[in-house]
Amino acid sequence: MRISPGEITKVLEDRIKEFKEEIDLQETGRVVQIGDGIARVYGLNSVMADELVEFVETGVKGLAFNLEEDNVGVILLGPYSQIKEGHIVKRLKKIIEVPVGEELLGRVVNPLGEPLDGLGPVEAKHTRKIEIKAPGVIYRRPVNTPLQTGIKAIDAMIPIGRGQRELIIGDRQTGKTAIAIDTIINQKGKGVYCIYVAIGQKTAAVARIVDKLREFGAMEYTTVVVASASDPAPIQYIAPYAGCAMGEYFMYNSKDALVVYDDLSKHAAAYRQLSLLLRRPPGREAYPGDIFYLHSRLLERAARLDDKMGGGSLTALPIVETQANDVSAYIPTNVISITDGQIYLEPGLFYSGFRPAINVGLSVSRVGGSAQIRAMKQVAGMLRIDLAQFRELETFAQFASELDPATRAQIVRGQHLQELLKQDQYSPLPVEEQVVVLYAGVRGYLDELPVESVRKFEKEFLDYMRTSKSSLLKLISEKKELTQEVEDELKKSIQEFLEGWHE
């Protein structure tokens, strides 16, 4: 087969016409120092704050954290043992994003959205930037829908609404995580998607939490984001923002979400470590000057959106650990001032067997009251007054024999109500069951019982209501208030039960 010179010429001319000169211009820099999860990079003159960069030789990504005159401080989001001085770093010209959506429900992932549960890759269709601006005032509406925790003391006296930020604060081992996990378990069937962010915790502790969530069927609507104690500080630093982005996906799609940050004390410590390594000037307790902004920009993203924005909500339950009950330390006071109230847990109550160890006097919910259902308001108002009076008189309880009958009656009522507020872990109650039990307490039906029989009464009374009076519970659940007719029926039910009940 012979090819004529004319054909060869034509092919060459066509190829020359098709040729496009492509120049791939990339801005790169070089590593001048590496260690402790931090790289100093020379070059990258146009890099933006918080922009993603890539270490070409290893494929590890990092965040441009410190922009200085002659170098860029990069925090590394992966293993850095293979990175050497002189390695090339290139800009990616984008902000860090994480996978979001319903595909993450039931999964345990790291803050980059990579699976940690061995169940295969996460097939998410959407991603979101981990740092975005919080919704403005104009796009929000007041908190007016309850988020039931299933815990009597909280739902009655420190109610939480959808879109609220409620801090859980207390010393280590006082049951802070237990309250958050019970709240997640209680969202079953309520259409609330949950994100649990574990920051700086032991991997074994997180594994136990995941097992419990699976046991109670809560992983169906929950994503667990883990930045464990063994993860580098940069991963712990981005964890809450990644969890928030996953929750925001549901909020901006007209759904309700709950995100738990466990805990922000360790998050602040990780940020302090990064800041000190990058030689940022230290302030109080060696934290950098923008530590308040670190948490405020995270927690401000929790909101209840107005109908024009879809009406979704993101509720935040940040957890902060105190040292020796010191609520006036730097991070606790910061987060208290950012949030809409706090649930304060006290070691003294915890060790005396009062669990959940909530100090009702120091705990407050600044906006949740308007979200409480009317039936609970009718019961909780009296409960709050009775407990406040009891706390005033408690010191006199040891002289009970010398007190007048009215004071003695108040002390007895308070002791019974305190016993009634005790609750086992992993046993959240539906709101209608809480209402009937607390109604029996505040109306004095338990005053004649020995204090030690109160828990037994509660268990057996609820069994009786579920089996014989389920229609009444359903009515309270639907009407959400104690009408005269419902109240009469409830009084009759309590009296009937007490007549046939044996301590």
Swiss-Prot record:
The keyword Secreted does not apply. It comes from the Bacteria. Its main location: membrane. SUPFAM superfamilies: C-terminal domain of alpha and beta subunits of F1 ATP synthase, N-terminal domain of alpha and beta subunits of F1 ATP synthase, P-loop containing nucleoside triphosphate hydrolases. It is found in: Cell inner membrane. It holds the Pfam family ATP-synt_ab_C. ATP binds at residues 170-177. It catalyses: ATP + H2O + 4 H(+)(in) = ADP + phosphate + 5 H(+)(out). Keywords: ATP synthesis, ATP-binding, Cell inner membrane, Cell membrane, CF(1), Hydrogen ion transport, Ion transport, Membrane, Nucleotide-binding, Translocase, Transport. F-type ATPases have 2 components, CF(1) - the catalytic core - and CF(0) - the membrane proton channel. CF(1) has five subunits: alpha(3), beta(3), gamma(1), delta(1), epsilon(1). CF(0) has three main subunits: a(1), b(2) and c(9-12). The alpha and beta chains form an alternating ring which encloses part of the gamma chain. CF(1) is attached to CF(0) by a central stalk formed by the gamma and epsilon chains, while a peripheral stalk is formed by the delta and b chains. Produces ATP from ADP in the presence of a proton gradient across the membrane. The alpha chain is a regulatory subunit. Belongs to the ATPase alpha/beta chains family. This is ATP synthase subunit alpha. It comes from Pseudothermotoga lettingae (strain ATCC BAA-301 / DSM 14385 / NBRC 107922 / TMO) (Thermotoga lettingae). The lineage of its organism: Bacteria, Thermotogati, Thermotogota, Thermotogae, Thermotogales.
